[in-house]
Amino acid sequence: MRKNFSTILIVGAALLLASCVQQKESFSPVDYVNPLMGTESTYAFSHGNTYPAVAVPWGMNFWSPQTGENGSGWMYTYTDSLIRGFRQTHQPSPWINDYGTFSIMPLSGVLKMDHKERGVPFSHTQEEAAPYSYSVTFADGLRTELSATSRGAVFEVTFPQDSAQYI
């Protein structure tokens, strides 16, 4: 009887110990970075003068959602409600002009070529930003995800069914 009790006690203790051990979630320091911090800037007052850059360390370029018009130094402003494209940039700050820049904008439905008209409504609740990736689902159901490479970017676009699709 004593041997059975000892066996049951050892097995019970092992089960209790196993249930207490939790798997540690692996976080990298980069997972604590919020690229949207500092993006609520205006011409009158700066709250950071940043944009949500997606890049790799020492990469040749950055990628960012673009809420401002082409030619505007204010590429992304948190208070805007339209995304006009996803911009390849070399711009380190809104105070320094950019060069060699272009935008890519996936659209569904009606094709709009004018950058002033092609903005698509979005909500920050449908936006995910990290230093290594950005994704947004637009009000029309179109979803765009991007990740940077050392010399470019990889896009994944999910279009709504039964609508015209453009990039």
Where are the regions a protein language model picked out?
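Bacterial N-terminal signal peptides that target proteins for export
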Residues: M1-L9
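Intrinsic disorder/low-complexity segments enriched in polar/small residues
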Residues: N4, Q23-K24
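C-terminal motif of bacterial Sec signal peptides marking the signal peptidase cleavage site
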Residues: A18-S19
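Accessory carbohydrate-recognition regions in carbohydrate-active enzymes
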Residues: K24-I167
